[in-house]
């Protein structure tokens, strides 16, 4: 009998959602490949990135993925975007996926340009399509842990899977809106991190709110342009998984991508800023992936390209800004 939810990944976002499910009453078995972290969680019942949060007795921990997913009625992942493929490959060795699998990470794979749901399909095969789901939207982990109101989107290919995921995550303070556009939700969640780095740079250089508003608006336009090429629904990018997530990531002081931009503006290098943040900055890696995809499809994405060049071609920040400001203006929605 399937009795619990298996959770893969125990970073702050993974811990946040695993705690939400456990506090709702579901038994949750959470996995991490980090034995030191698992030992600390088991012994101290506190997460190092959220030390004030008491861990629910419904939440247990393991370094054995098989233990986490065996007899689970649902599996949720919260690893880094770069960790999705290794997780999928490990899953392939130990199970035939036949329960809802919820992706909560955000990113685009480098070199392949694949969204995270597409990686799962490539590794596990098309037979898992009915079981795949995706959760995205404006959801700062610490606010969710504090019980602050939050609205997100859950997407799935299969209506029954969508219903199961919706029911599992829904709470009065964690409102879940159903959606069938997995690719659109995944793309919005990935690209907004790149725009947030640009906003962090603008803030760090004291450009003001007018500049940030322009970056957010034109950034959304870039997201929609790429979404159109990838057969996503434009309304998805206008909703919680697109505009909503973009806004919170570009304006919240808790946003690590925004803070990463601040550090770049202070003169730190890519590696120095990354070390200072101390956690994965997904936008720094998505900038490369998104640039590769845009170049392949011959799509003009100047903000994304600018961040890519700053991070990977050592373009001077001021020169990059000058290039953006000197671009010819054209009709707004072209």
UniProtKB/Swiss-Prot annotation:
Compartments it resides in: Cytoplasm
EC number: 1.1.1.94
Enzymatic reactions: sn-glycerol 3-phosphate + NAD(+) = dihydroxyacetone phosphate + NADH + H(+); sn-glycerol 3-phosphate + NADP(+) = dihydroxyacetone phosphate + NADPH + H(+)
GO molecular function term, any single one: glycerol-3-phosphate dehydrogenase [NAD(P)+] activity
GN (gene name): gpsA
Name used for this protein in its record: Glycerol-3-phosphate dehydrogenase [NAD(P)+]
Active site: 192 (proton acceptor)
Role of this protein: Catalyzes the reduction of the glycolytic intermediate dihydroxyacetone phosphate (DHAP) to sn-glycerol 3-phosphate (G3P), the key precursor for phospholipid synthesis.
UniProt-listed PROSITE patterns: NAD_G3PDH
UniProt pathway annotation: Membrane lipid metabolism; glycerophospholipid metabolism
GO BP annotations, alphabetical order: carbohydrate metabolic process; glycerol-3-phosphate biosynthetic process; glycerol-3-phosphate catabolic process; glycerophospholipid metabolic process; phospholipid biosynthetic process
Keywords on record: Cytoplasm, Lipid biosynthesis, Lipid metabolism, NAD, NADP, Nucleotide-binding, Oxidoreductase, Phospholipid biosynthesis, Phospholipid metabolism
Protein family: Belongs to the NAD-dependent glycerol-3-phosphate dehydrogenase family.
Residues binding NADPH, per UniProt: 13, 33, 106, 141, 256, 280, 282
Species name: Chlamydia pneumoniae (Chlamydophila pneumoniae)
InterPro entries assigned to the protein according to its UniProt record, in alphabetical order: 6-PGluconate_DH-like_C_sf (IPR008927), 6PGD_dom2 (IPR013328), G3P_DH_NAD-dep (IPR006168), G3P_DH_NAD-dep_C (IPR006109), G3P_DH_NAD-dep_N (IPR011128), NAD(P)-bd_dom_sf (IPR036291)
